């Protein structure tokens, strides 16, 4: 069952401690969400599901989208990851870093570093990474998450990274700056080979190799047995008792304030966001399943972290580091979907012909190029894709791709710092735009506008921008779902149009809620 035999594993661990990657092929036929449900059961305080969903006719009831097999539509869609039973959780708060051990695992003995409480949030995450060799890592045709840190970087980390040094006082923030599970067991679904494997990255040395291998064999057999008997969970409804959409006038006033700052030469653009909140009985797994159906996206995520769960369908890469390549994916320019392919093309053409949209997008691509250049070798930054229109369930976006070759003295944490936050979620110049956001927006952003993803043991990393998402806070007998969206404000922005843009960007999550909404007596309501 395990691809690496016992003798080879023992030899790899002989002069350890080392992180040794092993994989077991599983003979199962279950969907990733079913596997997630079966493996985490009632112990899902910390677990994750990361997927890349292709768009299908079933996800587009108006028939406006016909899927194809071009690179831009399938580039993310090969792997799904289910992480369960993490060894520990790393929580980075403004003044502290906490490592909470969740089970007996040798890797937890390697997590404490002398400097894990110093530096900024990304320095502190880096310091947690075990300073031991990584062995048995495939070099070709592999997924890039081989265990590591999986979680979120909240937008509010900007105070630690950028705003503290310019004297902006940090407000109370609802969530940690970062929270990442230390993952050594990951279920990997590979669509290209139609296979499922359990990838484990245990710590072993000469004294422990035999026992570690025995435990891996037992875990692979246990997981296969659990998943062979797994069935898709019944779809839970969502009962919403209270909704708060915020004050429209307050938002349009905030947009006008930002536009005035642009006209006064303070910034070129600022992204102003607003929040909707729904209280009630909200099942995160049901919401994820519905969101995947109505808004399949390159980055689908279900991230359970104790008293809060993040569910999302992001189209946009914050930063990716694969081997020595840095990638970011600025998206700026939004229009509605049409009711037919002809209407889609008309709306997309109007968007591409709009001078404001083109200028805004070009500015943000230039900002992304500058971000990537900060951590890239000289002369390696390029824009292989510029101003392409991609379609999603409720909107169309103008997208570009910026790449560079990672400098020899930089790593994935440096690349994340350079890209964070995305210019498409802050504005330009970044720091000055963030100062205005702090002054204009009524509440801290929390996870919205940050990043969700992973830092692999291998040095690879990939984080999506946390947009088209919702954070479910579990408090007592009731849950609160917070959905947030923003619009880029320039000198001639129409406040009412920007408000409608935020509504369109929230539509994916809210449509998923409506798909599951029930009445007080449990009857389904579909609107």
From Swiss-Prot:
It holds the Pfam family Anth_synt_I_N. PANTHER family: AMINOBENZOATE/ANTHRANILATE SYNTHASE, ANTHRANILATE SYNTHASE COMPONENT 1. GO terms for molecular function: anthranilate synthase activity; metal ion binding. Its cofactor is Mg(2+). Keywords: Amino-acid biosynthesis, Aromatic amino acid biosynthesis, Lyase, Magnesium, Metal-binding, Tryptophan biosynthesis. It catalyses: chorismate + L-glutamine = anthranilate + pyruvate + L-glutamate + H(+). Chorismate binds at residues 333-334, 448, 468, 486-488. Pathway: Amino-acid biosynthesis; L-tryptophan biosynthesis; L-tryptophan from chorismate: step 1/5. InterPro entries: ADC_synthase, Anth_synth_I-like, Anth_synth_I_N, Anthranilate_synth_I_arc_typ, Chorismate_C. Mg(2+) binds at residues 360, 501. Binds 1 Mg(2+) ion per subunit. Its EC number is 4.1.3.27. Component I catalyzes the formation of anthranilate using ammonia rather than glutamine, whereas component II provides glutamine amidotransferase activity. It comes from Halobacterium salinarum (strain ATCC 700922 / JCM 11081 / NRC-1) (Halobacterium halobium). One of its GO terms (biological process) is L-tryptophan biosynthetic process. It comes from the Archaea. Residues 53-72 are annotated as: Disordered. Tetramer of two components I and two components II. Belongs to the anthranilate synthase component I family. L-tryptophan binds at residues 52, 298-300. This is Anthranilate synthase component 1 1. The lineage of its organism: Archaea, Methanobacteriati, Methanobacteriota, Stenosarchaea group, Halobacteria.
